[in-house]
Amino acid sequence: MSNEKMHIESNTVQETLVIPLWGRKYCSEIYPEIYQDTTAKKIMEKLDYDFSTLEAKKNNTMFRFGYLEAAARYTDLGTEIRAYVKSHPAAAIVNLGCGLDCTAENNAGDTCKIYNIDRPDVIEVRNKLIPPTANTTNIGSDLNDTKWFEEIDDSNGVIFFAAGVFYYFLSDEVKKLFTAMAKRFPGGRLVFDTANKSAVKMMLKTWVKTAGITDISKYFYVNDLSEDLQVWLPDTKVSAKGYMLGYHDLKIPSVSGFFRLLSKIGDGFMKMRIVRIDFNKN
Protein backbone atom coordinates (compact mmCIF):
# COMPACT_ATOMS: atom_id res chain seq x y z
CA MET A 1 0.00 0.00 0.00
CA SER A 2 1.06 3.59 -0.62
CA ASN A 3 2.11 5.72 2.34
CA GLU A 4 0.27 8.70 0.87
CA LYS A 5 -2.49 9.89 3.18
CA MET A 6 -6.11 10.12 2.06
CA HIS A 7 -7.23 13.75 1.98
CA ILE A 8 -10.66 14.30 3.50
CA GLU A 9 -12.73 17.28 2.35
CA SER A 10 -15.41 18.91 4.47
CA ASN A 11 -19.07 18.10 3.79
CA THR A 12 -18.34 14.81 2.04
CA VAL A 13 -19.21 11.16 2.60
CA GLN A 14 -15.64 10.64 3.75
CA GLU A 15 -16.04 13.25 6.49
CA THR A 16 -19.18 11.56 7.84
CA LEU A 17 -17.05 8.42 8.28
CA VAL A 18 -14.04 10.16 9.81
CA ILE A 19 -15.91 11.91 12.65
CA PRO A 20 -17.15 8.70 14.35
CA LEU A 21 -13.71 7.18 13.68
CA TRP A 22 -12.14 10.01 15.69
CA GLY A 23 -14.82 9.39 18.31
CA ARG A 24 -13.80 5.75 18.72
CA LYS A 25 -10.18 6.80 19.18
CA TYR A 26 -11.25 9.44 21.71
CA CYS A 27 -13.41 6.92 23.60
CA SER A 28 -10.38 4.66 23.93
CA GLU A 29 -8.38 7.51 25.45
CA ILE A 30 -10.88 8.78 28.02
CA TYR A 31 -12.71 5.56 28.93
CA PRO A 32 -9.96 2.92 28.62
CA GLU A 33 -11.45 0.70 31.34
CA ILE A 34 -14.47 -0.15 29.21
CA TYR A 35 -13.43 0.50 25.60
CA GLN A 36 -10.34 0.02 23.48
CA ASP A 37 -10.10 0.39 19.71
CA THR A 38 -6.48 0.44 18.58
CA THR A 39 -7.61 0.02 14.97
CA ALA A 40 -9.20 3.48 14.94
CA LYS A 41 -5.89 5.13 15.78
CA LYS A 42 -4.09 3.23 13.02
CA ILE A 43 -6.70 4.24 10.44
CA MET A 44 -6.50 7.90 11.48
CA GLU A 45 -2.78 7.88 10.76
CA LYS A 46 -3.71 7.30 7.10
CA LEU A 47 -5.84 10.44 6.91
CA ASP A 48 -5.17 14.05 5.96
CA TYR A 49 -7.94 15.84 7.84
CA ASP A 50 -8.20 18.83 10.15
CA PHE A 51 -9.41 17.43 13.48
CA SER A 52 -9.03 20.77 15.31
CA THR A 53 -12.78 21.43 15.55
CA LEU A 54 -13.33 18.08 17.25
CA GLU A 55 -10.28 18.51 19.45
CA ALA A 56 -11.59 21.90 20.62
CA LYS A 57 -14.84 20.33 21.86
CA LYS A 58 -13.45 17.29 23.60
CA ASN A 59 -13.40 18.69 27.13
CA ASN A 60 -17.03 19.84 26.97
CA THR A 61 -19.06 17.92 29.57
CA MET A 62 -21.93 16.84 27.33
CA PHE A 63 -19.55 16.06 24.49
CA ARG A 64 -17.68 13.70 26.81
CA PHE A 65 -20.93 12.10 27.92
CA GLY A 66 -21.92 11.57 24.30
CA TYR A 67 -18.74 9.62 23.79
CA LEU A 68 -19.39 7.63 26.95
CA GLU A 69 -22.64 6.59 25.26
CA ALA A 70 -20.66 5.56 22.19
CA ALA A 71 -18.11 3.64 24.26
CA ALA A 72 -20.90 1.79 26.08
CA ARG A 73 -22.67 0.93 22.84
CA TYR A 74 -19.61 -0.55 21.14
CA THR A 75 -18.63 -2.40 24.30
CA ASP A 76 -22.14 -3.84 24.67
CA LEU A 77 -22.23 -5.01 21.06
CA GLY A 78 -18.75 -6.51 21.40
CA THR A 79 -19.94 -8.43 24.46
CA GLU A 80 -22.88 -9.81 22.48
CA ILE A 81 -20.63 -10.83 19.58
CA ARG A 82 -18.16 -12.66 21.82
CA ALA A 83 -20.99 -14.47 23.63
CA TYR A 84 -22.40 -15.71 20.33
CA VAL A 85 -18.99 -16.72 18.98
CA LYS A 86 -18.32 -18.71 22.14
CA SER A 87 -21.10 -21.12 21.17
CA HIS A 88 -20.65 -20.66 17.39
CA PRO A 89 -16.86 -20.46 16.86
CA ALA A 90 -17.09 -20.42 13.05
CA ALA A 91 -20.04 -18.02 12.86
CA ALA A 92 -20.59 -15.25 10.36
CA ILE A 93 -20.42 -11.80 11.96
CA VAL A 94 -22.24 -9.13 9.98
CA ASN A 95 -21.78 -5.40 10.61
CA LEU A 96 -24.84 -3.58 9.25
CA GLY A 97 -24.05 0.01 8.26
CA CYS A 98 -20.37 -0.50 9.07
CA GLY A 99 -18.78 2.80 8.05
CA LEU A 100 -15.15 2.49 9.19
CA ASP A 101 -16.07 0.56 12.34
CA CYS A 102 -14.03 -2.56 13.18
CA THR A 103 -16.18 -3.97 15.99
CA ALA A 104 -16.54 -7.26 14.10
CA GLU A 105 -12.79 -7.57 13.51
CA ASN A 106 -11.99 -6.63 17.11
CA ASN A 107 -14.30 -9.28 18.60
CA ALA A 108 -14.30 -12.15 16.10
CA GLY A 109 -12.58 -15.47 16.58
CA ASP A 110 -9.94 -16.67 14.12
CA THR A 111 -12.38 -19.05 12.44
CA CYS A 112 -15.20 -16.54 12.00
CA LYS A 113 -16.27 -15.01 8.70
CA ILE A 114 -16.75 -11.24 8.76
CA TYR A 115 -19.09 -9.27 6.53
CA ASN A 116 -19.20 -5.46 6.50
CA ILE A 117 -22.18 -3.89 4.71
CA ASP A 118 -22.76 -0.26 3.79
CA ARG A 119 -23.52 1.91 0.78
CA PRO A 120 -21.17 1.38 -2.20
CA ASP A 121 -19.52 4.80 -1.78
CA VAL A 122 -18.79 4.01 1.88
CA ILE A 123 -17.37 0.57 1.07
CA GLU A 124 -15.12 2.17 -1.55
CA VAL A 125 -13.52 4.31 1.17
CA ARG A 126 -13.37 1.38 3.60
CA ASN A 127 -11.57 -0.82 1.07
CA LYS A 128 -8.87 1.82 0.68
CA LEU A 129 -8.35 2.45 4.38
CA ILE A 130 -9.05 -1.06 5.74
CA PRO A 131 -8.25 -3.60 3.02
CA PRO A 132 -10.27 -6.77 3.69
CA THR A 133 -8.39 -9.82 4.93
CA ALA A 134 -8.96 -13.41 3.79
CA ASN A 135 -11.89 -13.96 6.16
CA THR A 136 -13.53 -10.57 5.49
CA THR A 137 -16.02 -9.59 2.79
CA ASN A 138 -17.06 -5.97 2.28
CA ILE A 139 -20.44 -5.58 0.57
CA GLY A 140 -21.58 -2.35 -1.05
CA SER A 141 -25.36 -2.36 -0.76
CA ASP A 142 -28.37 -0.54 0.60
CA LEU A 143 -29.45 -2.57 3.64
CA ASN A 144 -33.03 -2.46 2.39
CA ASP A 145 -32.03 -4.20 -0.85
CA THR A 146 -32.00 -7.73 0.52
CA LYS A 147 -30.00 -9.17 -2.37
CA TRP A 148 -27.05 -8.94 0.04
CA PHE A 149 -28.58 -11.83 2.00
CA GLU A 150 -27.23 -14.23 -0.64
CA GLU A 151 -23.63 -13.26 0.10
CA ILE A 152 -23.83 -14.33 3.76
CA ASP A 153 -22.70 -17.85 4.64
CA ASP A 154 -24.72 -18.66 7.75
CA SER A 155 -24.02 -22.41 7.73
CA ASN A 156 -22.17 -22.16 11.06
CA GLY A 157 -24.43 -19.56 12.64
CA VAL A 158 -24.72 -15.82 12.09
CA ILE A 159 -24.91 -12.74 14.29
CA PHE A 160 -25.87 -9.39 12.80
CA PHE A 161 -25.25 -6.14 14.65
CA ALA A 162 -25.85 -2.45 14.00
CA ALA A 163 -24.45 0.53 15.92
CA GLY A 164 -26.45 3.75 15.69
CA VAL A 165 -28.03 2.72 12.39
CA PHE A 166 -31.74 2.04 12.69
CA TYR A 167 -32.64 5.45 14.13
CA TYR A 168 -32.42 6.70 10.54
CA PHE A 169 -34.79 4.05 9.16
CA LEU A 170 -38.53 4.34 8.79
CA SER A 171 -40.42 1.91 11.02
CA ASP A 172 -41.91 0.24 7.94
CA GLU A 173 -38.41 -0.30 6.52
CA VAL A 174 -37.23 -1.90 9.75
CA LYS A 175 -40.30 -4.14 9.91
CA LYS A 176 -39.76 -5.34 6.34
CA LEU A 177 -36.01 -5.90 6.84
CA PHE A 178 -36.27 -7.72 10.18
CA THR A 179 -39.11 -9.94 8.96
CA ALA A 180 -37.09 -10.92 5.88
CA MET A 181 -34.00 -11.61 8.00
CA ALA A 182 -35.94 -13.82 10.40
CA LYS A 183 -37.25 -15.86 7.47
CA ARG A 184 -33.91 -16.14 5.64
CA PHE A 185 -31.61 -16.72 8.64
CA PRO A 186 -33.37 -19.10 11.08
CA GLY A 187 -31.21 -19.66 14.14
CA GLY A 188 -29.42 -16.35 13.62
CA ARG A 189 -29.24 -13.40 15.98
CA LEU A 190 -29.56 -9.63 15.55
CA VAL A 191 -28.38 -7.07 18.12
CA PHE A 192 -28.67 -3.29 17.88
CA ASP A 193 -29.16 -0.16 19.94
CA THR A 194 -32.46 1.64 20.24
CA ALA A 195 -34.33 4.21 22.31
CA ASN A 196 -37.85 5.50 22.82
CA LYS A 197 -39.63 8.08 20.69
CA SER A 198 -38.61 11.07 22.83
CA ALA A 199 -34.94 10.10 22.76
CA VAL A 200 -34.92 9.45 19.00
CA LYS A 201 -36.55 12.82 18.41
CA MET A 202 -33.77 14.50 20.40
CA MET A 203 -31.01 12.53 18.65
CA LEU A 204 -32.30 13.26 15.16
CA LYS A 205 -33.24 16.90 15.75
CA THR A 206 -30.54 18.45 13.56
CA TRP A 207 -30.74 15.80 10.84
CA VAL A 208 -34.54 16.02 10.67
CA LYS A 209 -34.42 19.80 10.27
CA THR A 210 -31.80 19.60 7.52
CA ALA A 211 -33.72 16.89 5.66
CA GLY A 212 -37.01 18.78 5.91
CA ILE A 213 -38.75 15.93 7.75
CA THR A 214 -41.92 16.90 9.59
CA ASP A 215 -43.15 13.59 11.04
CA ILE A 216 -40.53 11.92 13.25
CA SER A 217 -43.10 9.35 14.39
CA LYS A 218 -42.56 7.42 11.16
CA TYR A 219 -38.97 6.69 12.15
CA PHE A 220 -37.96 3.62 14.12
CA TYR A 221 -38.08 3.73 17.89
CA VAL A 222 -38.96 1.26 20.64
CA ASN A 223 -41.14 2.36 23.52
CA ASP A 224 -42.21 -1.19 24.38
CA LEU A 225 -40.59 -4.43 23.21
CA SER A 226 -43.88 -6.29 22.94
CA GLU A 227 -45.83 -3.59 21.10
CA ASP A 228 -43.06 -2.23 18.89
CA LEU A 229 -41.16 -5.43 18.01
CA GLN A 230 -42.45 -8.77 19.26
CA VAL A 231 -45.97 -8.28 17.90
CA TRP A 232 -44.76 -8.37 14.29
CA LEU A 233 -41.94 -10.87 14.90
CA PRO A 234 -43.91 -13.77 16.41
CA ASP A 235 -41.34 -16.43 15.46
CA THR A 236 -38.50 -14.78 17.35
CA LYS A 237 -37.33 -14.23 20.90
CA VAL A 238 -36.91 -10.54 21.71
CA SER A 239 -34.99 -9.35 24.78
CA ALA A 240 -33.10 -6.25 25.85
CA LYS A 241 -30.67 -4.78 28.36
CA GLY A 242 -29.97 -1.20 29.36
CA TYR A 243 -27.66 0.49 26.88
CA MET A 244 -25.62 2.35 29.51
CA LEU A 245 -25.81 0.20 32.65
CA GLY A 246 -27.13 -3.15 31.48
CA TYR A 247 -23.69 -4.61 30.78
CA HIS A 248 -21.52 -2.78 33.32
CA ASP A 249 -22.10 -0.52 36.32
CA LEU A 250 -19.67 2.20 35.10
CA LYS A 251 -18.17 2.42 38.59
CA ILE A 252 -14.75 3.20 37.17
CA PRO A 253 -12.37 6.13 37.74
CA SER A 254 -13.00 7.73 34.36
CA VAL A 255 -16.79 7.98 34.86
CA SER A 256 -18.12 10.53 37.35
CA GLY A 257 -21.14 10.08 39.58
CA PHE A 258 -22.92 12.71 37.48
CA PHE A 259 -22.34 10.67 34.33
CA ARG A 260 -23.64 7.55 36.06
CA LEU A 261 -26.78 9.50 36.98
CA LEU A 262 -27.22 10.58 33.35
CA SER A 263 -26.70 6.97 32.32
CA LYS A 264 -29.46 5.85 34.68
CA ILE A 265 -31.77 8.47 33.17
CA GLY A 266 -30.86 7.30 29.67
CA ASP A 267 -31.66 3.67 30.41
CA GLY A 268 -34.79 4.62 32.34
CA PHE A 269 -36.57 7.69 31.00
CA MET A 270 -35.24 7.39 27.43
CA LYS A 271 -35.37 3.58 27.36
CA MET A 272 -31.95 3.31 25.75
CA ARG A 273 -31.51 -0.39 25.07
CA ILE A 274 -29.41 -3.00 23.37
CA VAL A 275 -32.02 -5.25 21.78
CA ARG A 276 -31.37 -8.89 20.93
CA ILE A 277 -33.59 -10.75 18.49
CA ASP A 278 -33.09 -14.50 18.12
CA PHE A 279 -34.56 -15.87 14.91
CA ASN A 280 -36.21 -19.19 15.72
CA LYS A 281 -35.25 -22.23 13.69
CA ASN A 282 -37.96 -23.58 11.43
Identify the residue ranges that each predicted region occupies.
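Conserved beta-strand signature within the Rossmann-like core of class I S-adenosyl-L-methionine
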Residues: M181-K197
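A conserved beta-strand element that flanks and buttresses the S-adenosyl-L-methionine
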Residues: F160-F161
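Short amphipathic alpha-helix with an adjacent loop that forms part of the alpha/beta core around
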Residues: T146-N156
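Conserved catalytic loop of SAM-dependent methyltransferase domains
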Residues: D235-L261
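Rossmann-like AdoMet
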Residues: M1-V94, C98-I139, D154-S155
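A short, conserved alpha-helix within the catalytic core of class I
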Residues: Y168-M181
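Short, glycine-/aromatic-enriched active-site segment of Class I SAM-dependent methyltransferases
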Residues: K201-I216
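Short alpha-helix
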Residues: I216-Y243
